[in-house]
């Protein structure tokens, strides 16, 4: 009896722990946000993958176009890797905004195309917290169009360091941006 209970407990622990330590999540245009995020059951949106990911996880994005209605908020250390920078396209903006500003956040973006910030203000990638290391490798930022009436003027930028407010007193300390084979 004890062996049987021990065996059932072990099976239960293994079955319920699947995905808890998952460091790689997968996103595909054919996925569903109700999926677990594994290679065989990818998620549909990058935002959902970020929500499900542990701090320091890697999100692997399949070829496709990923339109965003609102900015994708990145509140933790994460790596997002696209299949390639020509065919893996995020249409929208990324806001890097950590709640715990005393710790460092490392955001690595690779092999992605980030484009069309036409209805959004600021830039395509907005650093809104201090202590951020942003690393871009094989990332292309383009088709920037400024918003109107929000004080941002006639042009928009690829990467903007905003701080927590949008006035002249906004300062982000200790923000590092590293570019490798990237086009801004």
Residue ranges, per PLM feature:
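Positively charged n-region of N-terminal signal peptides that target proteins for export
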Residues: 1-4
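Extended, compositionally simple hydrophobic/Ser/Thr-rich segments
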Residues: 166-170
């Amino acid at each position: 009896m004890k062996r049987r209970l021990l065996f059932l407990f072990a099976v239960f622990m293994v079955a319920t722990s699947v995905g808890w330590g998952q460091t790689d999540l997968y996103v595909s245009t054919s996925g569903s946000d109700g999926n677990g995020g594994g290679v065989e059951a990818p998620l549909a949106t990058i935002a959902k993958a970020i929500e499900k990911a542990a701090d320091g996880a890697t999100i692997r994005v399949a070829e496709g176009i990923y339109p965003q209605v609102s900015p994708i908020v990145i509140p933790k250390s994460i790596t997002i890797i696209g299949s390639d920078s020509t065919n893996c396209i995020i249409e929208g903006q990324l806001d890097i905004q950590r709640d715990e500003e005393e710790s460092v956040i490392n955001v690595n973006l690779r092999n992605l195309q980030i484009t069309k910030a036409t209805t959004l203000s600021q830039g395509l990638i907005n650093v809104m917290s201090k202590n951020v290391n942003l690393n871009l490798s094989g990332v292309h930022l383009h088709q920037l169009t400024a918003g109107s009436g929000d004080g941002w003027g006639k042009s928009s930028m690829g990467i903007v360091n905003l701080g927590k407010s949008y006035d002249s007193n906004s300062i982000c300390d200790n923000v590092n941006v590293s570019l490798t084979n990237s086009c801004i």
